[in-house]
Amino acid sequence: MNQTLLSEFGNPTERVERALDALRHGRGVLVLDDEDRENEGDMIFSAESMTVEQMALTIRHGSGIVCLCLTEERRQQLELPMMVEKNSSHYQTAFTVTIEAAEGVTTGVSAADRLTTIRAAIADNARPSDLNRPGHVFPLRAQPGGVLTRGGHTEATVDLMTLAGLKPSGVLCELTNDDGSMAHAPEVIAFAKQHDMLVLTIEDLVAYRIAAERKAS
């Protein structure tokens, strides 16, 4: 990643720490992955504090595939089977079956309905019966070890929530351009400025976690 493009958001450590602070205060962040990987930017929000307005922004400016990133423990708690037994996707993106809240939604498509589904899934006492399958929210299972084992947006989302001291569940959606194409670094940065959001990279988060673990040891 061209660090010059991101310099206005701080150095790598500052970018992570500012992103964590933003998440603690209920704001969203934008996360870029490697140029040699998907080379895309995702909007990421805390699942426990996301608002209807933020969900509407996500749907309006994103791919439409609103994903809920979960730990393996939460996936098991909700008894969500993986979408396929043999994952042949290029980056091994770990989708489970899609979900809908069993109560409190209409068609499940609106911003409010999708948020209701997410809140049902992350509730402390959530049960499998609280969710219908299929639905309009796409859960993703994060790998144990986070970005240190897989450099994906799913793992970055759960790592960010954990480091921020929040529930380890987050909402992500790929940012798209007005013509429907995927947003890359320049477009992501322009969107961030327009919507007062912070930008960081998965590479920043990997370095931050490695430094933190070295310090702890």
Swiss-Prot record:
Mg(2+) 2 binds at E38, H153. It comes from the Bacteria. Mg(2+) 1 binds at E38. Keywords: Lyase, Magnesium, Manganese, Metal-binding, Riboflavin biosynthesis. Belongs to the DHBP synthase family. Binds 2 divalent metal cations per subunit. Magnesium or manganese. This is 3,4-dihydroxy-2-butanone 4-phosphate synthase. It is an enzyme of class 4 (lyase). It comes from Pectobacterium atrosepticum (strain SCRI 1043 / ATCC BAA-672) (Erwinia carotovora subsp. atroseptica).
